Amino acid sequence: MSKLASPQSVRALLERHGLFADKRFGQNFLVSEAHLRRIVEAARPFTGPVFEVGPGLGALTRALLEAGAEVTAIEKDLRLRPVLEETLSGLPVRLVFQDALLYPWEEVPQGSLLVANLPYHIATPLVTRLLKTGRFARLVFLVQKEVAERMTARPKTPAYGVLTLRVAHHAVAERLFDLPPGAFFPPPKVWSSLVRLTPTGALDDPGLFRLVEAAFGKRRKTLLNALAAAGYPKARVEEALRALGLPPRVRAEELDLEAFRRLREGLEGAV
């Protein structure tokens, strides 16, 4: 068993370095050996360089390296430098101490992979940006269960929204399994989920997502009223909805990605 695969060993390591898990960085360290193995298996095959965001104490990093991955680990918390240098000593890892949101993701090699226990507060903006780059072959990451549900939601459900459609536009999404709070130290207050995204190669479409964001900007309103409030000509929206066979009182959450694409075509040049 890894020396980082129990709450007791993690606590001892932190105490030895005079450290504590910092909520500002969303630090909940994975301490379940079984779940570490499952994450590594879900990420295979390692067909390109692996980027890990938020390596923490290095448990997942070490597991990936031992499985043959070429890993660049990006950590914002400079306090963890001596810990990672200890836990990953002698292993061929590239450590980068930087805010992951400021990393030049658009320059990573084509076919790269993300494998990470993501700091939950940056998960949505980071995953969105990585998908937009078009440079990743696979993204496998832990997030709050609620965020995983939003990424994989179906139309007409409360979790369905902009994030669902952003993910669906760029990738095939799978929620592989859930992890209880006890799989981490310190245990978070919520369950977590492992998500795997397999990009399809679709490029970013700013016009489509302006429409989607406007549609969900006033979720309680009808789609017609939400788009009118965002500046889309009401008569043009009514005409486009009729052409799609949609009732005037339809709401944004009832449309799947293809319906939004067709609606966008019908509204082309309306704003």
From Swiss-Prot:
Coarse class of the protein's main subcellular location: cytoplasm
Catalytic activity annotation: adenosine(1518)/adenosine(1519) in 16S rRNA + 4 S-adenosyl-L-methionine = N(6)-dimethyladenosine(1518)/N(6)-dimethyladenosine(1519) in 16S rRNA + 4 S-adenosyl-L-homocysteine + 4 H(+)
Enzyme class: transferase
Keywords for this protein: Cytoplasm, Methyltransferase, RNA-binding, rRNA processing, S-adenosyl-L-methionine, Transferase
PROSITE patterns linked: RRNA_A_DIMETH (PS01131), SAM_RNA_A_N6_MT (PS51689)
GO MF, one example: RNA binding
Residues reported in the UniProt entry to bind S-adenosyl-L-methionine: N28, L30, G54, E75, D99, N117
Presence of the UniProt keyword Cytoplasm in the record: yes
EC number: 2.1.1.182
Top-level division of the source organism's lineage: Bacteria
GO cellular component: cytosol
UniProt function note: Specifically dimethylates two adjacent adenosines (A1518 and A1519) in the loop of a conserved hairpin near the 3'-end of 16S rRNA in the 30S particle. May play a critical role in biogenesis of 30S subunits.
Sequence similarity: Belongs to the class I-like SAM-binding methyltransferase superfamily. rRNA adenine N(6)-methyltransferase family. RsmA subfamily.
Protein name from the UniProt record: Ribosomal RNA small subunit methyltransferase A
UniProt organism field: Thermus thermophilus (strain ATCC 27634 / DSM 579 / HB8)
